[in-house]
């Protein structure tokens, strides 16, 4: 009887370990911030300002884009067969109401998280899904970037529903690549964060916390 009980407990333990599989992407520390790759958008007047803060849930990243555009990127391998879901906690304090985000003149978002798959020798050949916190579009709206067909904007949150409050969202990246790019991606090559207002010439303020991939 003791052997049976032990086997049951062991099976439950294995199940809980499997269900808890996670891969943390950003720690949001000062040291990490200094090491992340900063990419200024070509033609932007200034860089987005990124700073580290802390609340009851741990460290977070604050982004202030005032007629500015630059992103923070990390090259990291993510096994999408193992952990296909991206989880993001974020907040928009100042949004970009009134712009047309799916046009070249209005292609700005208060908060974005890119997931990137290398598909060629140069960055221009990469495929990306740009998960965005929109100020004007609806959740689950998606469209190819007006600047490149290889990046698709996908709305996970909108200030029409959640403004100036923390919200946590989840997306199945593996399935989204199949749906949006017609690609069966087994491994990602990088993740990036950006807040940008270089097209609208406006100001946006956003926050990021607890960005990780999970098995479910």
Each PLM stretch: what is its role?
Residues 106-151:
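Extracellular/luminal beta-rich ligand-recognition
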Residues 108-113, 149-150, 156-159, 163-203:
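Extracellular beta-strand ligand-recognition surfaces/modules
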Residues 50-71:
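Short carbohydrate-recognition loop motifs
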Residues 28, 191, 209-213:
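Extracellular beta-strand elements of beta-rich domains used
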């Amino acid at each position: 009887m003791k052997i049976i009980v032990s086997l049951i407990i062991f099976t439950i333990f294995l199940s809980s370990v499997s269900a808890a599989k996670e891969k943390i992407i950003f720690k949001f520390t000062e040291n990490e911030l200094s090491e992340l790759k900063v990419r200024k958008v070509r033609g932007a007047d200034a860089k987005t300002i990124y700073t580290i803060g802390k609340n009851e849930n741990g460290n977070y990243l604050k982004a202030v884009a005032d007629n500015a555009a630059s992103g923070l990127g990390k090259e990291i391998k993510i096994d999408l067969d193992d952990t296909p879901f991206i989880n993001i906690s974020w907040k928009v304090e100042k949004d970009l109401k009134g712009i047309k985000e799916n046009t070249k003149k209005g292609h700005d978002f208060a908060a974005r998280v890119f997931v990137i798959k290398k598909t060629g020798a140069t960055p221009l050949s990469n495929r990306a899904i740009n998960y965005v916190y929109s100020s004007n579009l609806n959740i689950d709206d998606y469209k190819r970037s007006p600047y490149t067909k290889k990046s698709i904007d996908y709305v996970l949150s909108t200030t029409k529903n959640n403004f100036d409050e923390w919200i946590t969202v989840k997306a199945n990246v593996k399935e989204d690549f199949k749906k949006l790019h017609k690609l069966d991606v087994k491994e990602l090559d990088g993740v990036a964060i950006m807040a940008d207002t270089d097209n609208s010439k406006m100001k946006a303020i956003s926050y990021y916390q607890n960005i990780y991939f999970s098995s479910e």
